Amino acid sequence: MPRSSIVSRIAHDSYRHSPSTMPSGRWWENLDCNFCDRPEGFELEPWDWARVNATAAVDQVMKAWGGTLLAGTLPVGFLPSFTRDAYTDTPEDWQVYTDLVAEGSDPLRFFRPPPDDTRVTHYDPNWGFFRPDAGRCLGLKFESPYVPFNERLAPTFRNYRNNSIARARYWCHDKGPRPTLVAIHGFMADPYWINERFFSLKQFYDRGYDVVLATLPHHGLRAERSSYYSGQGFFTAGISGINEHMGQAICDLRVLLGWLRRERGVDKIAVTGVSLGGWTSALLASIDEDLEAVIPNVPVVSPVDLLLEWQPAGGIVRAGLFALRWSVRKLREIVAVTTPLTYQPKLPSERLMIIGGVGDRLAPPKHSRLLWDHWGRCRIHWFPGNHVVHLDRGEYIAQMESFLDQLDFRYVEAGEQDLAEAG
């Protein structure tokens, strides 16, 4: 592995020669059952140690709060049921997904291509903190064409009114088409005004990119009126629902990417995402080979192991496993169909980059490390912050810019391009 693949000071020496954490074969069976309890192996200087532990303490509080919210949601759809309740799983439902991963690792068997004729409309949004001087800010929406792979969930999805309309925010220059950066928010973190700043979208826009913020299923305006919080619907249809909602997220994003290519003439698209969005963007790397780059930020790669760490929700999951006499491996197998570790990326490692937080306790760095090993130890940057407070964020934004520049992900005026070709 070239030394330059780790582009941050933290963990540079301690990780460079360390053995891979990614097991061979079926990862859901061969990954340590106690992966969620595995310590983080960082060697930190005193100043970094202080910052990491301070931010990690904040994450522990947020994790308890998030775990409490999920604990009120999980019993509805996660407790095993042998009835045909629309909001509970059955063994037959689980078999649908385990059969898929048993038969091979082709992601397109579950993530089926969306139709090409989905109509995307745009409108002027009522508000937005970033209004470009030279360009437009547009709201995008379209009817999600997603049909659940598990046919039993089709009536449930048809009953979702708000979630059936996919949405995004699009900042585009007057002159185009431009290289476009698509950003995907995290769980419960959908407000555009937050993500405009978090992803430094103005900075990327000023570099000549067009930028898009996509809204995940059951978040923001896609949340149903009955939801207590944004993102709740992602978990109210059981384990099957998580798989299908991730399937819908990928489907809607592929519609959006197709629209950018066909209708806007965009030929260079990079995708980044944080947390749940990092999980989603990592999956896209295994599905869309035409992407220029994928940059997951504090990604989740084994949601079952993550959930076991979020108390009290993790206790509910452990109780369910005990009642079924299952190990965590069985639960991993059910969600493996929507996990990036199950598939090989279609992009070469030179077009992949991971950003991980050393003090992150909501999506711990062991997840970023596992994906890094799975992706052949591509470029990675470690920052000394938690899930929300990304200390030294300016450093990894600069690394992202440098990474994209190396891929020639830039806008060149027509006259400049002619001169370059003539030279």
Regions found by a protein language model. Name each.
Residues 182-247:
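Cap/lid segment of the alpha/beta-hydrolase catalytic domain
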Residues 361-367, 392:
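Conserved alpha/beta-hydrolase "acid-adjacent" motif
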Residues 160-165, 172-180, 206:
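Proline/glycine-enriched tight loop/beta-turn segments at coil->beta junctions
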Residues 280-329, 382:
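Hydrolase active-site cap/lid region
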Residues 1-153, 160, 207, 417-423:
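N-terminal targeting or regulatory segments adjacent to alpha/beta-hydrolase or S9 domains
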